[in-house]
Amino acid sequence: MTTTTVTSTPLAEKTVLAPKAELHIHIEGSLEPELIFALAERNGVKLAYDSIDALRAAYAFTDLQSFLDIYYAGASVLLHEQDFYDMTMAYVERCLADNVVHSEIFFDPQTHTERGVPIATVVAGIERALADAEQRGMSSKLILCFLRHLSEEDALATFEEARPLFEQYRHRLIGVGLDSSERGHPPSKFERVFAKARSLGLKLVAHAGEEGPPSYIYEALDLLKVDRVDHGVRSIEDPALVTRLADSRVALTVCPLSNLKLCVFDDLTKHTLKDLLDRGVAVTVNSDDPAYFGGYVNANYLATIDALKLNDAEVYTIIRNSFEASFVTPGQRSELIAKLDAHWHPGGPH
């Protein structure tokens, strides 16, 4: 992971110290090379790389698929409940360092069940770490994601296996999502499984409009009936869609450094986040797969502020959006926004 140097501008320092929420993080994508090697040794898993440096050197992605290939290889070291605990606690430490006070975390059960690891094992390890995080002042939710390159039948089977867990962990496991290879796998492919999730009262999110066209965002909204759109940066190509997103306040969980690393944009100065913000869309800033993409939440904020020349009011709005778009109770949302306001406007609103 590359480290972003905190510049000495007042806005950068204010942003780093601000309480914030993360709404787009794949827990398997927080698995740093050092922990991959430690878990491989603990579990007797043979890796294709002979050193941590060799693994880092393989992080030269050209697109989403080339990243996913190595992402799934890295996840192969996760076998036992303790492995999922250790991975999640490492992410929690990063959150605490970045003043992330609330996180809504994705996990990919099919990545593990196809290796014989039950979903219950995955969730038990993650939940134990998140319960420990609560004792340190960080709240969280968990969202089960279906892999879109697999069939809807596979997603339906995964949903049924997970069904008891939605009850057992109803305080934490509050929704479903859709991720993995976007091209050729439109949201419409998963209409039935999202309808089942909706019938249980679960929250719904989906990756759309990262590499896929704006039509995928329409499908996520109209067919899957999502509460939030993950990525969504290609919505800018359709003015009517941008207006709809702005009017409905359906948030986009944008991941700037991920978009740069996966060549969605060839330069961060060309990112659409500010254009969307200017048009009233509820954009947020997130890390996606931080171990692979070179930065956790603060690194994403700092790079985006620098590249897009964001001002104080714009950064405040983005951070506030992260709380507004979260799946917390209205009471907790008000408390989180009050903490942000106390930090951002210490003398009260100006």
UniProtKB/Swiss-Prot annotation:
Which Pfam families would you find in this protein's record? A_deaminase
Q: Which CDD domains has this protein been placed in?
A: ADA
A cellular component annotation (GO) from this entry: cytosol
Broad enzyme group: hydrolase
A Gene Ontology biological process term: nucleotide metabolic process
Give the cofactors, semicolon-separated.
Zn(2+)
Record-listed Zn(2+) binding positions? 24, 26, 207, 288
Q: Where is the active site?
A: 210
| Sites marked Important for catalytic activity | 231
Please tell me where substrate binds in this chain.
Answer: 289
EC numbers, comma separated: 3.5.4.2
Per the annotation, how and in what number is the cofactor bound? Binds 1 zinc ion per subunit.
> What catalytic activity does the UniProt entry give for this protein?
adenine + H2O + H(+) = hypoxanthine + NH4(+)
Q: Which UniProt keywords apply?
A: Hydrolase, Metal-binding, Nucleotide metabolism, Zinc
> Mind telling me which Gene3D superfamilies this protein's record contains?
Metal-dependent hydrolases
Q: Show the GO MF annotations.
A: adenine deaminase activity; zinc ion binding
- Recorded superkingdom: Bacteria
Q: What does this protein do?
A: Catalyzes the hydrolytic deamination of adenine to hypoxanthine. Plays an important role in the purine salvage pathway and in nitrogen catabolism.
- What family is this protein classified in? Belongs to the metallo-dependent hydrolases superfamily. Adenosine and AMP deaminases family. Adenine deaminase type 2 subfamily.
Q: What name does UniProt use for this protein?
A: Adenine deaminase
Q: What is the lineage of its organism?
A: Bacteria, Pseudomonadati, Pseudomonadota, Betaproteobacteria, Burkholderiales
